[in-house]
Design a protein with these regions (language model features):
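Phosphate-handling architecture centered on phosphoinositide signaling
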Residues: 2-163
Length: 163
């Protein structure tokens, strides 16, 4: 078995360097390193909790789209968010349990996934390329998700942005 004479030393050096970098990344703030504070535009616009936002979906044949929601296929639409219009955006119904719940209840209140860059690569809503609109069909208060996500955020747990 042919081995380089310094393989052990190289492996030890790589291991020590990895450990040092790990410690730096985990304790960066206590060592004086500051995290990037660059907020994306959608965080302050769409997820501003001081107001109620409007999201309007404009399609030529809404009824046909609703009838085919269970296929979970993207369809072209326009989206107007708080007065800002975005054309040639993709939308589809999302979910598994929620899709079957909507069907069982005889409702048309689907959850949707909006994809801004599905047809036009690079198109975003102030940096956001996908947006989920949840139907909250099993939440009569329509507040559980919002309250849990906000609570998780206050405790420092990674959670989706919500509004």
């Amino acid at each position: 078995m042919a081995a380089h004479k310094k393989t052990d030393r190289i492996c030890c050096a790589v291991l020590i360097l990895s450990l040092i970098l790990t410690v730096l990344f985990m304790n960066g703030e206590s060592l004086g390193l500051q995290a990037s504070a660059a907020a994306l535009g959608y965080e302050t616009r769409l997820f501003d909790t001081t107001k109620v936002h409007t999201v309007d979906i404009v399609m030529d044949d809404w009824d046909s789209f609703i009838e085919s929601c269970e296929n979970e296929e993207y369809s072209a639409c326009a989206v107007v968010i708080d007065g800002e219009s975005y054309k040639n955006v993709a939308i589809r119904a999302k979910g598994n349990t929620s899709l079957s719940s909507v069907r069982q209840l005889g409702s048309q209140r689907y959850s949707f996934k909006i994809e801004f860059d599905h047809y036009d690569s690079g198109k975003t809503y102030h940096g956001l390329d996908k947006l989920c609109l949840n139907n909250l069909i099993q939440d009569n208060t329509m507040m559980k998700d919002y309250l849990v996500y906000r609570l998780m955020g206050q405790f420092g747990v990674a959670s989706p942005l919500c509004s």
